[in-house]
């Protein structure tokens, strides 16, 4: 087994028995693949049925109303973005690129005859069609400078669905849902009548739709019912028994007798195949029936007197005596009737036709028009156009390929081609037929929560739909422009206005429900947000009306959606996460991978199955035991089939799970011993990992699952080598790799990776990358070169390993509180850096422009000490609450001055009183260090000193970076040429003869530019040198071009909002240590609040004097049933013990042979998966041992983790008791505790619920306008509400003075509170109470009722 660069430094011991069959697919592919399909910019000529291309093809050509112009689509191009991703974030711009569409305007001769078109001219050009946001490499969008994610939506798939309303007997319904267009419903009522609805409007008879399609009443009956022939004469009535086989299974309503009056089949019996044979053998072809039965029948076809052409009866008329008499009169002795006798099937349509008052197609169309457009007078043309536009015109109605596939599959017919996306007559007839079958018990209703009936709409598809909406508006505009613009040489640009497209796309990305501000607490929260699947949003469910069934876990979720990870609260079950191995197929259905089983042997062939396909197969679990030939060991195997768990013979198994973790999401797969935790707690654990704050120093989990490196790799926060090579240069800002051209298919000799330093994330956490490679290290493509935030050697590291004791300590563990050791604070274990962005905007006001200046009235020198001459804070300044960050003055209205004031103004040249200080200050309760300042201003007034200084610094840095980059390229080219040419024969060189041997010494005397002029006799060598020469020249040109582009983007003017003159952004880094009140959690849903930070000497300690780091309450485990944390603590202790063992060996010797023995015992004595230590050389073994001193990292995959015996064995090797318990001593008294305590290492996280962000106090502040009471909440700088129940409490104590204070001066007594503030300032401790404002509000409300209420002061005066 080969190890990557990072793995060699720290190998994770892996438990788990199951073989590794399939790598976890790229976690962000659901985002990147979808948008790639939409844009397909890199495969311009191969664009077929995807995204932009198909929308443009469907929308064009556009024809003018008079037919003179036609605008055709030819091709499109996506340009280059103006700024790169980083630049867009800094400037608050959108990362997008212009879309240019090539359009062809065909002009026809207007004098030509009506039916002939003579082309007069063709004009073609590229037309700008708005900007399309581009996706970053990590699957996000940058919109107005902020990173956003478009969440995929799970919605009802287009197609037909049959359901039953349980509130009413027989209330079955069918709904045809298109991808785009009107919904069509058919439903039964309790009487058996079939009704139709269009777009959930007023219902009408279903037969109206059939008539509107052109069917006559006779054809409708023929399609939906059987007919039988009745003969009649003087003896009575007889029913002909033709098509006997069709009557099988039906209930007979009469006796069948033979010629001798023997009963063959009795009345009220279901007809069987044997009965049919008996009837045929007896030669019975008809059976006598009485008139009572005949009178319940209806005519199947129109009855016409052939002699006169007169209609005696219409189809569906009741059979009556008078009708029979009329038939006898014209000599008709047999009658074709609808078969209600042997089957009830025809009655539904027949009864519906009785309710239907329309008689033909025209009347049916008018009826539909009245339903959809009530109040509009129906004109013949508009009536037909409306109906056709509903379901039969592709621009307005589309089932899409998914809808057509689902409709054909559900109706079990392929009559309609899969390329037809509108409804056909046969579709509607088929749906009604299937609905009748379901009502008759011959079909099943659909399960709407089955993942075969729900599909995923990803980002590309949503943007495509939005683009279509915009293009539809553009299309309307083009038609209008064609008829309005009168120009001799009309060009496509003149008639196309792209603003509707830009507006539609901008609206989607800025305010769409599924375009969300990216959750960026840590790399996991980013990955999870991009893999989220929401049932909410436009066209989806609403959380208020979603019932339990929709939210529940469904059998088809297995391997597709995670059954664990979903939010707590109103969105539970509506927002899900994609399972680790799941993918979305071309139709938008979720698929899960399985191993194919052939003749009882499990192969390594992988097949992805959708939920629909999976229903038909028997699938074994991943943990099913196999022998060495991959055959099943046991005869009876637990499997899944059709959504049920079953035991079945091994010969029946068709597929097998790929991995034990395939049913859970990436976040849940990070929880070790997940299988030992209660599901509710795992849900909390998975969600809380996303809230973990990245700490100053990242530390890998000692007990992991092996998923850590996959999440870290795919999150995009680490830097990954593009090509194999050698590390040439490393510093904190960049890594330079000299590429190994033999291993890598690239012409580049050098790869340069720039690192992100101290960048603010969406959640104000700090993004910082650190190199983990050293100069001279050999790396392969795909190796981790630098860690991102919350990663450690390429593994996700959200928290720290702490020594935990499960024991109470003086009540400080009450209600899940956590007791922490002061060592954790001293070692900065949970210290995190948060970067806050403060923005100051100078606007142009009515009274004049606001100004950012250091000259501010009535502000002391000390307050301005941290500002530069432009009035902006210096980088590196330590700022406290209330400090000025950006000094700004705002003009205020001029007041009338007395002559004396004017004179004083003139003498002292004072202009200060007509401006107000509106500076940006540091908010209360915060302090930190200024790490960056950005200034954006309009170029009209010229740039300020600070802006020019920042610009110069950025240009100098860019120049330095590019010079260094070129220097590296030059040195690499130089060394590669030197290796090849020293000792070669010269063809031509200044200072040497032809045929001379080139030496190192001669090369050293020449500048590098002269090296490139030397030519050689050896042709192959000459070719190599020529390639290096060309690469060098191209690199020089490319770097100069890159620098010029960078310089242009730095100096480019900023587009500020209207009325804004200048924007200053100040970034302040705030260091937050852990303190009481902060929330912490483990990975098993075991959360709590830090109650006290205890000095190290008071903490309980072990026999060797080692103090524990954390005390947790043991009562938090039994009722929560998350036993995984105990197992994690035990295994963590074993891991720590193994680390100590390696450390002791290192102290004794640094010989690789001895170390290998220890490592062999540590890694390979327990568990099935062995570590190949032979793959590491002696130096790598030493490095590995140095990195393992703190503990040997262990991977215990979910559902395939370490067993109890494994943990005990490891504890034994690590030198601990196998029960994981030990004697602890009280740090205060030195006495041992009464019982042994469970102690172990647990991975704990600090969550983004910090007490600093919640702590808040107020004396005076803002008040509500109406009630004049203080506002609420920290954001409004509000007060604490003293509510009704609190008032009762004070009343109960009789604290009258406190109560008066609370209800008046501290609340809404305006005059009283002003007076009180003045008294406090003056040092007087008296309180005057006035009328509270709430009384005035009440008085005004009573006045609204016409009652005047006022205080009566007369009694006091008397």
Curated annotation (Swiss-Prot):
CDD domains documented for this protein: RNA_pol_B_RPB2
Reactions catalysed: RNA(n) + a ribonucleoside 5'-triphosphate = RNA(n+1) + diphosphate
Subunit: The RNAP catalytic core consists of 2 alpha, 1 beta, 1 beta' and 1 omega subunit. When a sigma factor is associated with the core the holoenzyme is formed, which can initiate transcription.
Function: DNA-dependent RNA polymerase catalyzes the transcription of DNA into RNA using the four ribonucleoside triphosphates as substrates.
Single GO BP term: DNA-templated transcription
Cited Gene3D superfamilies: 2.40.50.100, 2.40.50.150, 3.90.1100.10, DNA-directed RNA polymerase, beta subunit, external 1 domain (2.30.150.10), DNA-directed RNA polymerase, subunit 2, domain 6 (2.40.270.10), RNA polymerase alpha subunit dimerisation domain (3.90.1800.10), RNA polymerase Rpb2, domain 2 (3.90.1110.10)
PANTHER family reported for this sequence: DNA-DIRECTED RNA POLYMERASE I SUBUNIT 2
Transmembrane spans: none
GO function terms (MF aspect): DNA binding; DNA-directed RNA polymerase activity; ribonucleoside binding
Protein's name according to its UniProt entry: DNA-directed RNA polymerase subunit beta
Enzyme class: transferase
Alphabetically ordered keywords of this record: DNA-directed RNA polymerase, Nucleotidyltransferase, Transcription, Transferase
Pfam family, one: RNA_pol_Rpb2_1
Documented EC number(s): 2.7.7.6
SUPFAM superfamilies assigned: beta and beta-prime subunits of DNA dependent RNA-polymerase
InterPro entries per UniProt: DNA-dir_RNA_pol_bsu_ext_1_sf, DNA-dir_RNA_pol_bsu_external_1, DNA-dir_RNA_pol_su2, DNA-dir_RNAP_su2_dom, DNA-dir_RNAP_su2_hyb_sf, RNA_pol_bsu_bac, RNA_pol_bsu_CS, RNA_pol_bsu_protrusion
Family statement: Belongs to the RNA polymerase beta chain family.
GN (gene name): rpoB
GO cellular component: DNA-directed RNA polymerase complex
């Amino acid at each position: 087994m080969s190890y990557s660069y990072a793995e060699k430094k720290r190998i994770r011991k892996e438990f788990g028995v199951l073989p590794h069959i399939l790598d976890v697919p790229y976690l962000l592919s659901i985002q990147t693949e979808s948008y790639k399909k939409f844009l397909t910019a890199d495969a311009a000529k191969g664009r077929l049925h995807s995204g932009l291309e198909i929308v443009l093809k469907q929308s064009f050509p556009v024809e003018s109303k008079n037919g003179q112009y036609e605008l055709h689509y030819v091709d499109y191009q996506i340009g280059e973005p103006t700024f790169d991703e980083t630049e867009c974030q800094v400037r608050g711009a959108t990362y997008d690129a212009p879309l240019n569409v090539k359009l062809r305007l065909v002009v026809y001769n207007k004098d030509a005859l009506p039916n002939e078109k003579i082309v007069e001219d063709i004009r073609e050009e590229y037309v700008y069609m708005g900007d399309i946001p581009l996706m970053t490499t990590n699957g996000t969008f940058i919109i107005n400078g902020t990173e956003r994610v478009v969440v995929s939506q799970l919605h009802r798939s287009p197609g037909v669905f049959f359901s039953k309303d349980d509130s009413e007997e027989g209330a079955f319904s069918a709904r045809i849902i298109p991808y785009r267009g009107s919904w069509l419903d058919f439903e039964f009522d309790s009487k058996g009548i079939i009704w139709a609805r269009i777009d959930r409007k007023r219902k009408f008879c279903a037969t109206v739709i059939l008539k509107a399609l052109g069917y006559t009443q006779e054809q409708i009956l023929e399609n939906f019912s059987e007919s039988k022939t009745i003969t009649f004469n003087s003896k009575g009535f007889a029913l002909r028994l033709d098509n006997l086989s069709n009557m099988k299974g039906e209930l007979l309503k009469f006796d069948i007798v033979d010629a001798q009056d023997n009963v063959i089949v009795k009345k009220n019996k279901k007809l069987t195949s044997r009965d049919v044979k008996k009837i045929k053998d007896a030669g019975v072809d008809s059976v006598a029936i009485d008139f009572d039965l005949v009178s319940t029948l209806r005519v199947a076809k129109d009855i016409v007197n052939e002699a006169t052409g007169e209609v005696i009866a219409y189809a569906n008329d009741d059979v009556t005596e008078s009708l029979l008499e009329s038939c006898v009169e014209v000599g008709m002795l047999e009658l074709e009737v609808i078969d209600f006798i042997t089957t009830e099937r025809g009655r539904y349509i027949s009864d519906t036709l009785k309710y239907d008052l329309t008689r033909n197609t025209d009347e049916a169309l008018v009826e539909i028009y009245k339903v959809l457009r009530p109040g509009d007078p129906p004109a013949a043309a508009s009536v037909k156009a409306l109906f056709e536009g509903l379901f039969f015109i592709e621009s307005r109605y589309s089932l899409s390929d998914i809808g057509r596939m689902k409709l054909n599959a559900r109706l079990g017919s392929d009559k309609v081609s899969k390329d037809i996306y509108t409804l056909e007559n046969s579709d509607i007839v088929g749906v009604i037929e299937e609905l009748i079958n379901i009502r008759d018990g011959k079909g099943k209703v659909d399960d709407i929560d089955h993942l075969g009936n729900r599909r995923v709409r990803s980002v590309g598809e949503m943007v495509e739909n939005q683009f279509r909406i915009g293009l539809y508006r553009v299309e309307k505009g083009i038609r209008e422009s064609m008829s309005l613009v009168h120009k001799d040489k009309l060009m496509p640009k003149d008639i196309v206005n792209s603003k509707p497209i830009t507006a539609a796309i901008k609206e989607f990305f800025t305010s769409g429900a599924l375009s969300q501000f990216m959750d960026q607490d840590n790399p996991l929260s980013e990955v999870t947000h991009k893999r989220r699947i929401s049932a909410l949003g436009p066209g989806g469910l609403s959380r208020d009306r979603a019932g339990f069934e929709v939210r529940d876990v469904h059998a088809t979720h297995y391997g597709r959606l995670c059954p664990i990870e979903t939010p707590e609260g109103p969105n539970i079950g509506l927002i899900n996460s994609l399972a680790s191995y799941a993918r979305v197929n071309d139709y938008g259905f979720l698929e899960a991978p399985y191993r194919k089983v052939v003749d009882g042997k499990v192969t390594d062939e992988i097949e992805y199955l959708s939920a629909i396909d999976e229903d038909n197969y028997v699938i074994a679990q991943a943990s099913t035991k196999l022998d060495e030939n991959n055959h099943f060991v046991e005869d009876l195997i637990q499997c899944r089939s059709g959504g049920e768990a079953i035991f079945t013979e091994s010969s029946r198994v068709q597929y097998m799970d790929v991995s034990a973790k395939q049913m859970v999401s990436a976040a849940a797969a990070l929880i070790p011993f997940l299988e030992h935790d209660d599901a509710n707690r795992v849900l909390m654990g998975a969600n809380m990992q996303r809230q973990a704050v990245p700490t100053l120093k990242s530390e890998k989990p000692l007990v992991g699952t092996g998923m850590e490196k996959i999440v870290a790799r795919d999150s995009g926060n680490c830097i990954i080598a593009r090509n194999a090579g050698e590390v040439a240069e490393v510093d904190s800002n960049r890594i330079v790799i000299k590429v190994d051209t033999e291993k890598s298919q690239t012409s580049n000799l050098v790869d340069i990776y720039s690192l992100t330093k101290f960048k603010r994330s969406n959640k104000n956490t700090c993004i910082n990358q650190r190199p983990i490679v050293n100069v001279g290290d050999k790396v392969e493509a795909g190796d981790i070169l630098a860690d991102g935030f919350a990663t450690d050697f390429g593994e996700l590291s959200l928290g720290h390993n702490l020594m935990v004791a499960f024991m109470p300590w003086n009540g400080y563990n009450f209600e899940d509180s956590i007791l922490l050791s002061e060592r954790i604070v001293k070692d900065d274990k949970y210290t995190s850096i948060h970067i806050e962005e403060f923005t100051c905007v100078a606007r142009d006001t009515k009274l004049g422009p606001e100004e950012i200046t250091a000259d501010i009235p009535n502000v002391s020198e000390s307050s301005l000490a941290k500002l530069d001459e432009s009035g902006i804070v210096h980088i590196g300044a330590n700022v406290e609450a209330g400090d000025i960050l950006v000094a700004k003055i705002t003009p205020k209205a001029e007041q009338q001055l007395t002559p004396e004031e004017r004179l004083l103004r003139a003498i002292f040249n004072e202009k200060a009183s007509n401006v107000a200080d509106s500076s940006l200050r540091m908010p209360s309760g915060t302090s930190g260090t200024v790490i960056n300042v950005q200034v954006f201003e309009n170029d009209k007034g010229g740039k300020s000193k600070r802006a020019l200084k920042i610009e110069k610094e950025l240009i100098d840095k860019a120049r330095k970076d590019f010079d260094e980059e070129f220097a590296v390229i030059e040195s690499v080219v130089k060394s590669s040429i030197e290796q090849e040419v020293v000792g070669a024969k010269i063809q031509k060189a200044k200072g040497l003869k032809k045929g001379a041997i080139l030496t190192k010494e001669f090369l050293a005397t020449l500048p590098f530019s002269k090296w490139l002029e030397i030519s050689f006799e050896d042709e192959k060598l000459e070719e190599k040198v020529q390639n290096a020469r060309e690469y060098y020249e191209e690199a020089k040109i490319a770097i100069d071009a890159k620098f010029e582009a960078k310089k242009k983007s730095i100096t480019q003017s900023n587009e500020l909002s209207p009325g804004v003159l200048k924007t200053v952004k100040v970034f302040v880094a705030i260091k937050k240590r852990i303190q009481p009140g902060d929330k912490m959690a483990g990975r098993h849903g075991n959360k709590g609040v830090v109650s006290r930070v205890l000095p190290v000497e008071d903490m309980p300690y072990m026999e060797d004097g080692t103090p524990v780091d954390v005390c947790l309450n043991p009562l938090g485990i039994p009722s929560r049933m998350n036993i995984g944390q105990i197992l994690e603590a035990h295994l963590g202790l074993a891991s720590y013990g193994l680390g100590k063992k390696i450390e002791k060996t290192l102290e004794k010797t640094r010989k690789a042979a001895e170390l290998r023995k220890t490592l062999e015992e540590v890694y390979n004595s327990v568990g099935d998966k062995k570590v190949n230590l032979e793959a590491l050389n002696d130096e790598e073994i030493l490095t590995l041992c140095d990195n393992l001193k703190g503990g040997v990292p262990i991977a215990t995959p979910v559902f395939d983790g370490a067993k109890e015996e494994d943990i005990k064995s490891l504890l034994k090797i690590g030198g601990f008791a196998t029960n994981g318990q030990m004697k602890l001593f009280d740090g205060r008294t030195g006495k041992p505790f009464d019982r042994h305590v469970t102690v172990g290492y647990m991975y704990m996280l600090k969550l983004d619920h910090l007490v600093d962000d919640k702590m808040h106090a107020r004396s005076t502040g803002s008040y509500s306008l109406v009630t004049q009471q203080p506002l609420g909440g920290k954001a409004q700088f509000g007060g604490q509400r003293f509510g009704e129940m609190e008032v009762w409490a004070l009343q109960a104590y009789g604290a009258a003075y406190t109560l008066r204070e609370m209800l008046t001066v501290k609340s809404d007594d305006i005059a009283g509170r002003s007076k009180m503030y003045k008294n406090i300032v003056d040092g007087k401790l008296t309180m005057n109470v006035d009328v509270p404002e709430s009384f005035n509000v009440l008085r005004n409300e009573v006045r609204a009722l016409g009652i005047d209420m006022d205080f009566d002061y007369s009694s006091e005066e008397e």
